[in-house]
Amino acid sequence: MPSKWSRRTFLKTSLATGAVLAAGELPSFAGWQKARAAGKDEVLSVPSLCEMCGVKCGIIARVRDGRVVKIDGNPKHPFSNGKLCARGNAGMTALYDPDRLRQPLKRVGDGKFEPISWDDAMREIGAKLKDLKAQFGPETLVWATHPELINPWEKHWMAAFGSPNLTGHAATCYSSRTVAFATTYGDLPGVDYGNVQYYLSPGRNLLEGIHNGVIQKIVAAKAKGARLVALDPRMSNFAAWADEWLPIRPGTDLAFLLALIHVIIAERLYDEAFVAERTVGFNELKDAVRDYTPAWASGITDIPAETISRIARELAAARPAAAVDTCWHGGFGSMYYNSVQTGRAAACLNALLGNLGAKGGLTFSPVVKLGKTDELMGPKPPKIAARRWDGAGEAEWPLAKGLGLVQNLPDQILSGRPYPIKALIVSHFNPVRSCPDSKKVIDALQKLELLVAIDIQMSDTAAYA
């Protein structure tokens, strides 16, 4: 990584999205330089990563005369194995969309924008940020983003500015399940989809989801005889394809999982050796679920008690190659009041199956150390003195670390507490659409003195910049 980045380079890199890119120019690495130099009839193959979602499948861009003419999957990519979903195959539409923003735009009236140069945009944004920082302190700036490869640079930039307020998408998507598994296991595991023999999906719709490689593996597992059970209020594509669909009442997954735990413990179907050697709190869990019978759960979930008991026994019979999915959204994404506890119940259930680290169970990925931006050569950012605007990680929200609680941002902007938030930079994120209560989000955006939207389209949020 370069030790010195200009503001212009940083913000232009922030714009990179779509299948191959989405800033105003192609990334300047060797493959693209060769593509630019190629003759009109020569087609070059340039490996890259798909940016149409966060999974980042491997792609090969076919380039003729400096223009991408086709996108294929990269067969050497270890996860996607040369396959692309419909969104990935459509990546060129983002790259060459006639409505794609190719240069900065400045508001000149209600709903009116005019082009402005990069230098002028940086100069005006920098001057306004400097003025607001002098009036209200560096914490007056919030940077709202999506978890992407550029996040370390965003964090580094905010530290240099002096603001602790880097926030974003996670809390409106998957933070609750991440917190649930991290507080139970210490980390968020995945599922060994290719070898699972019994798979329970609490609301996860694999066939219409974004994990290309996971779909390939679960299809292979079913071909080998795995039993797939979909727990979902909706007859999704996955539910229709699974061996069994359980049409649960929305938001009642916790009751269902607690009843499964009750049956497995009451009938001593759990992995006793694993529980004795590698868990703590079993007796407390046993006492806690004593009254959570299948009959109790049936009245809440609309799933027959006999079905709940059968599913519990089938899961236990297939252990350790049985798994309750750790999901993405599903029954314990950031959608329900009890989502964290639902995720914790799923974690406890998997532990009772003794499937942690087992073939066909849950898997933990090794941590790869790639270095940190604060270890780069050059000036070190000063220690940030201000508290976060949302109190994430503190007494009120001790588990809400990382990117914090973006859904609370409109209230903070409108109330001015705990301090005034006057500037917001939004990158790879559309809070008007993603956050609850869009009207309140819009009201908050209109109260700001500076809103900068880094996007390739005139998104719902960019329209208020």
PLM regions and their residue ranges:
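N-terminal export/assembly segments and adjacent metallocofactor-ligating motifs
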Residues: 1-267, 304, 425-427
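N-terminal leader/propeptide and maturation segments of large enzyme subunits in energy/redox metabolism
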Residues: 105-118, 269-305
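Alpha-helix capping and helix-loop boundary segments enriched in small/acidic/polar residues
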Residues: 116, 184-190, 205, 209, ...
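Flexible, glycine/charged-enriched surface loops at secondary-structure junctions
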Residues: 136-140, 270-275, 321-325, 357-364
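A glycine-rich phosphate-binding loop feature that marks nucleotide/adenosyl-phosphate handling sites
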Residues: 146-147, 277-279, 328-329, 362-373
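Extended redox/cofactor-interaction regions of prokaryotic respiratory oxidoreductases
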Residues: 153-219, 224-231, 238, 254-258, ...
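Core structural elements
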Residues: 312-321
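Short, solvent-exposed helix-loop connector elements
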Residues: 325-337
